[in-house]
Amino acid sequence: MQNTTLMNKSIELFCGTGGLALGLQNAGFQHTALYEWDKDSCDNIKANIAAGFDGISDWNVYQSDVRTVSYDGLTGKINMISGGPPCQPFSLGGKAQAYNDKRDMFPEAVRAVREVMPEVFIFENVKGLLRKSFSLYFSYIILQLTYPSIVKPQGMTWEEHRTLLEQHHTSNRHGDCEYNVVFRLLNAADYGVPQLRHRVVIVGFRKDVD
């Protein structure tokens, strides 16, 4: 059993059945809360907790729509936010409507970062996110995570907001609440998993974090 007194605090959105959460737990993060909309996934985690699996006994799992989650009181208390937003808007097997798909939850990932201001965040999604047809929207996601405090005004399109963010990025006029954001396409098979599973991993570090 790990010494949780030395762990960094984290919350996870779109936690599914807890695979990413378990990996981060093993890496030294203590999950304050895990949010997932799907009941079966939540029941799966709760069954594993009840079965006494090591390291997850203190997980607090909430079956919630992340659009209703309040992060009041968490600013400065959470070191990391993680999660895997629904992949259907970008999946090769879906309709690939990106921002126009109501299941696109990247805006909620950005909201969580903006309201909690963690030291670091990590989000993963399918490799379809890197398709040429999504290039502008993907750059929009990265810009939002880089400057989460620049909120899209009511009535502004995402394309217009992207242009605004790009202008800020180019001129470097907006220094507060910035994150250094990087992304990589990774294959789980390269890390000991017996499965070809490609995922885009987006990581951001708050600029005041050394």
Spans of model-derived segments:
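Conserved SAM/SAH-binding beta-strand->alpha-helix loop
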Residues: D38
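Well-ordered alpha-helical segments embedded in enzymatic catalytic cores
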Residues: G19, N44, M105-E108
